[in-house]
Swiss-Prot record:
Protein name (Swiss-Prot/TrEMBL): Antimicrobial protein CAP18
Family to which this protein belongs: Belongs to the cathelicidin family.
Source taxon at top rank: Eukaryota
InterPro entries named among the record's database cross-references: Cathelicidin-like, Cathelicidin_CS, Cathlecidin_C, Cystatin_sf
Compartments reported by the entry: Secreted
Signal sequence extent: 1-29
GO CC field: extracellular space
Lineage: Eukaryota, Metazoa, Chordata, Craniata, Vertebrata
Entry keyword Signal: yes
Gene symbol of the encoding locus: CAP18
Gene3D superfamilies tied to this protein: 3.10.450.10
Keyword terms of this UniProt record: Antibiotic, Antimicrobial, Disulfide bond, Secreted, Signal
Stated role: CAP18 binds to the lipid A moiety of bacterial lipopolysaccharides (LPS), a glycolipid present in the outer membrane of all Gram-negative bacteria. Has antibiotic activity.
GO molecular function, one term: lipopolysaccharide binding
GO biological process: antimicrobial humoral immune response mediated by antimicrobial peptide; defense response to Gram-negative bacterium; defense response to Gram-positive bacterium; innate immune response
Amino acid sequence: METHKHGPSLAWWSLLLLLLGLLMPPAIAQDLTYREAVLRAVDAFNQQSSEANLYRLLSMDPQQLEDAKPYTPQPVSFTVKETECPRTTWKLPEQCDFKEDGLVKRCVGTVTRYQAWDSFDIRCNRAQESPEPTGLRKRLRKFRNKIKEKLKKIGQKIQGFVPKLAPRTDY
């Protein structure tokens, strides 16, 4: 009878331990995807930044090393843009709208995809403004402007010539 009495108690404890084991996060850290590693680097940039507003990921370059080990530093490059949210907000950058004329920064560095290490070496600098048009675009723009001026002059000459073609009424 004693064994029968302890039977349900042992089953209950076993079930409880099983449920607790399922609810607990795994002790082994999982590897981050490339995108997750970049997003964590953006978070680290926001935490270390002295800027007034948060920055949000605008774009990221494709992963350069496909088969790299997760604990090996991998090169990353991405672009962030200033949001409307102040740095002191509790919002995630993904919840913030981009600032209309917000600063854009180009970031390069290395990250590890091994979640337990959280290793980032990122440098972000203000992105270059749109470069002045050079080469073919610049020549096409000049050509277009010359054509506009020539057409304007031709239009003025035609307007001056048309009144001379009208029949004279003073006989």
